[in-house]
């Protein structure tokens, strides 16, 4: 009965600082969009050119860490004393479901165009060599390497959850073995948590900024409603209201059902694209791209282009590594929670094999379709981007498929549901992280969830107002910098504690 009388509420030291920082940055941006774009370009150039190498080494070192976990002294250690909570098939399916966000649909549909129009290694734009390397680079950015880094952090969080029985809702909770309880629960831990929250807020706002134009462009195609910034703002507002209604009326089960529908619909849509786009070409292109990936892998891992300064690794590899870094803690906590009872080796292999298969299927099917449409001159992506923006170009890659109306309805529903679940997850994660006395499995206060969803929505609108991909890329890279150090500290804390307390 004592536990039932716990008083939940905001934790001021991790609620107000991120709110104030993000609020000030949004206000300064809206106040002068042109000046904001100048600052954004400067920040992007500085971080990617001066510190891009650090992100590349981080990924390589974490890959070696994955091998250490799989073949080292903890490989057969079980994460908890209970049997696995989910069957292997359900476990893999839940991993796949976590990959089917609207932001992933965004990049999967258009990424290959950028790789072949501005290719790496001094290749000619739109050349045969650029096209051969295009999908290979997608497989590199969304393949075993980043998932291996997530494996290490997932093992770390699963260890703290199920072996050490810690309640972890913020990264500072895991740092006690590394810096001591005094610092982990004091000013140092508060700073770490605030870095994490500010970065996460911008990351979620970025995802919303990518997802919203896809929905509004679908609306223009299906209903003839012109796509404007005002329409984007209205749609984001509707999502926030819908999220508030779901939370207030206890409709979270409905949100979970929507998440399942999203996963099944993703399978259906990908299968449709695979069949009608050209299954034989897709499989041949994928096979060839795996070979290209293996051939160029050493160069890709360490490519910084300091002599030619073409900008490809800064604009894409460093950006994506920052993307993975910024979502690492949130994603790893989720993957850890669904992996109770599995061994370290099972978790590491399951994540790398299962999640790589998920992202490789997405990027192979969608990227191959886009390349075919370009080669057959069915759509002119450069003109579409110049006149209408990236989202319109993505929509046209789907609208060019047979049964275009049915296809567009499917894509519209998929993007809409994916974004509803995104807003719900955003508000829940941020509210859990900024409230006190809210335990895992409990619902944080309604007003706090609504407040965070509003702020994330505002960030999405601000990024859309700035226009283009550079503000989105910069928000991710800037947010990834502090999380780079936080992720390393969580990793070191796990290693130190495991050596002391996870013995035979």
UniProtKB/Swiss-Prot annotation:
Effect noted on mutating residue 299 to A: Does not affect transport activity. Forms mostly monomers. Can also form small amounts of homodimers and homotrimers. Shows a high tendency to aggregate
Cytoplasmic side: 1-12, 68-90, 152-186, 249-253, 336-349, 432-446, 491-504
GO BP, sorted A to Z: 4-(trimethylammonio)butanoate transport; carnitine metabolic process; carnitine transport
Catalytic activity: 4-(trimethylamino)butanoate(in) + (R)-carnitine(out) = 4-(trimethylamino)butanoate(out) + (R)-carnitine(in)
Record annotation: effect of changing residue 304 to A: Does not affect transport activity. Forms mostly monomers. Shows a high tendency to aggregate
Ranges in the topological domain labelled Periplasmic: 31-51, 99-131, 220-230, 278-311, 373-403, 467-468
Effect listed in the UniProt record for changing residue 330 to L: Decrease in transport activity
Null mutant phenotype: Essential, it cannot be deleted.
Function description: Catalyzes the exchange of L-carnitine for gamma-butyrobetaine. Can also transport D-carnitine and, with lower efficiency, acetyl-L-carnitine and glycine betaine.
UniProt protein name: L-carnitine/gamma-butyrobetaine antiporter
Species in which this protein is naturally found: Escherichia coli (strain K12)
């Amino acid at each position: 009965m004592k536990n039932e009388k716990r008083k939940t509420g905001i934790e001021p030291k991790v609620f107000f600082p991120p709110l104030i920082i993000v609020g000030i940055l949004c206000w300064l941006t809206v106040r002068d969009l042109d000046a904001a774009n100048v600052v954004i370009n400067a920040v992007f150039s500085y971080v990617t050119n001066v510190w891009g190498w650090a992100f590349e080494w981080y990924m390589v070192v974490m890959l070696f860490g994955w091998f250490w976990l799989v073949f080292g002294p903890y490989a057969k250690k079980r994460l908890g004393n209970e049997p696995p909570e989910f069957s292997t098939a359900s476990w893999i399916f839940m991993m796949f479901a976590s990959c089917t966000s609207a932001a992933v649909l965004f990049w999967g549909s258009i990424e290959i165009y950028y790789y072949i129009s501005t290719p790496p290694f001094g290749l000619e734009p739109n050349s045969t060599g650029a096209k051969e390397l295009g999908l290979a680079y997608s497989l590199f950015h969304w393949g075993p390497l980043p998932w291996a880094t997530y494996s290490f952090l997932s093992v770390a969080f699963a260890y703290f959850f199920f072996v050490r029985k810690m309640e972890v809702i913020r990264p500072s909770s895991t740092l006690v073995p590394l810096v001591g309880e005094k610092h982990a629960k004091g000013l140092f831990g508060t700073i770490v948590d605030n870095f994490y929250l500010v970065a996460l807020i911008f990351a979620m706002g970025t995802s919303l900024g990518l997802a919203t134009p896809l929905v509004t462009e679908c609306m223009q195609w299906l209903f003839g409603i012109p796509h404007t910034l005002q329409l984007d703002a209205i749609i984001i507002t509707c999502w926030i209201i819908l999220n508030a209604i779901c939370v207030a009326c206890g409709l979270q089960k409905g949100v979970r059902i929507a998440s399942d529908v999203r996963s099944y619909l993703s399978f259906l849509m990908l299968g449709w694209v695979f069949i009608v786009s050209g299954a034989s070409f897709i499989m041949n292109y994928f096979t060839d791209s795996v070979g290209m990936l293996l051939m160029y892998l050493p160069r890709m891992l360490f490519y910084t282009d300091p002599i030619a300064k073409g900008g490809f690794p800064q604009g894409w590899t460093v950006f994506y590594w920052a993307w993975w870094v910024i979502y690492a803690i949130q994603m790893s906590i989720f993957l850890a929670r669904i992996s109770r009872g599995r061994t370290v080796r099972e978790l590491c292999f399951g994540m790398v094999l299962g999640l790589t298969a998920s992202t490789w299927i997405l990027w192979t099917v969608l990227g191959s379709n886009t390349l075919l449409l370009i080669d057959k001159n069915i759509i002119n992506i450069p003109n579409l981007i110049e006149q209408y923006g990236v989202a319109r170009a993505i929509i046209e890659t789907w609208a060019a498929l047979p049964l275009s109306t049915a296809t567009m309805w499917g894509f519209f529903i998929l993007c809409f549901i994916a974004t509803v679940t995104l807003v719900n997850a955003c508000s829940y994660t941020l509210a859990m992280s900024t409230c006190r006395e809210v335990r895992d499995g409990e619902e944080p206060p309604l007003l706090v969830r609504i407040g965070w969803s509003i702020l994330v929505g505002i960030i999405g609108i601000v990024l859309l107002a700035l226009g283009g991909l550079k503000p989105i890329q910069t928000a991710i890279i800037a947010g990834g910098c502090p999380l780079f150090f936080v992720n390393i500290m969580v990793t070191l804390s796990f290693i130190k504690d495991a050596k002391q307390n996870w013995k035979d």
